[in-house]
Amino acid sequence: MGERYDSEPTVYDRLLDQVRELLGAGDDALLVEANIAVNHALQLHPDSVDAWLLKCQVASATGDDLAALAAIEMALRRSPHRPEGLYWRGAVLGDLGRHREALRSIEAAFRVLGDAEHWLLEDLFYEKVTILDALGLHDAAVAACAAGLERCPGSALLRAALAPAERARVRGSLKVLRGGA
């Protein structure tokens, strides 16, 4: 009696699942509840990388990019080579307009990506395309998109990103022609 079996979720586990569910609902009205739950999880386990990653996602979803950056830095301080953390750091830095730093973080995530994190590949490529495009590196953005489609051939997200990246690349190569009057 009173024994806990490994298969039984703890309060902490239930809180993280609740945060994931609330984030997954895509309803901004639920973000306050998600924030309360993730804060409670962090009170229980302040060194939890997963909780800090979720805190970053909640802050990002509410538009608080500085809080998202602080949360992801807390996660990366505890697990500096975690691909998901490096991805989120890149995404948040991109949102803050710090594109070169964002690109470095995304590239670092690619370098440490293992088979277990294959689910992250499509998002990494998409974020890389977005950042390269924001930097005005349209040829590189198109190439990254093509590489992403090669690795994730069924990606509707990358196919959707290819057209704007390609248009930006072509637009950048057009010359202004002076007409005679």
What are these regions (language model features)?
Residues S7-E8, L174-G179:
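Short hydrophobic short-linear motifs embedded
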Residues P9-D50, L54-S60:
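Alpha-helical segment of the N-proximal tetratricopeptide repeat
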Residues D27-A37, T62-M74, R98-A108, L135-A144, ...:
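Structural signature of tandem alpha-helical TPR/SEL1-like repeats
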Residues R77, F110-R111, L149-E150:
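Amphipathic alpha-helical segments of tetratricopeptide repeats
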